[in-house]
């Protein structure tokens, strides 16, 4: 399953560029959630500006990429859209996680 993952931390909710995003091929939702967790943890660690327990601040959304769109095509478009625009163009509307 090809998915788009938008990972961030809860304090800023992805504002100020404090987020990560990627298009990945996963076997199931468990694997997608593992990617989301690692990506969100990477966001928090990269900014090194949170004193509280970061575990509670890790958040991510997972969307299924529309049929007929390749990983390469979707990945190439990431920098051209914000999350909402990318989802509208390349993803099914339902949030999987």
Regions from the language model: what does each represent?
Residues 1-20:
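Short aromatic-glycine-(Arg/Gly/Cys) micro-motifs in beta-strand/loop hairpins
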Residues 4, 24, 60:
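A broad, low-specificity signal marking well-ordered, structured residues that form hydrophobic/aromatic
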Residues 11, 29, 65-68:
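Generic structural motif
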Residues 16-30:
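A short, exposed loop/beta-hairpin motif centered on an aromatic-Gly-Thr core
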Residues 31-36:
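Short, conserved charged micro-motifs
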Residues 38-97:
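Short, mixed-charge low-complexity intrinsically disordered segments
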């Amino acid at each position: 399953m090809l998915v788009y993952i938008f990972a961030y931390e809860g304090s800023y909710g992805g504002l100020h560029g404090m987020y990560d995003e990627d298009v990945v091929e996963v076997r199931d939702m468990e694997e997608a959630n593992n990617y989301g967790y690692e990506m969100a943890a990477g966001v928090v660690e990269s900014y090194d500006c949170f004193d509280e327990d970061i575990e509670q601040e890790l958040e991510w959304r997972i969307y299924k990429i529309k049929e007929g769109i390749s990983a390469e095509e979707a990945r190439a478009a990431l920098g051209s859209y914000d999350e909402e625009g990318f989802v509208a163009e390349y993803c099914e509307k339902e949030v999987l996680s």
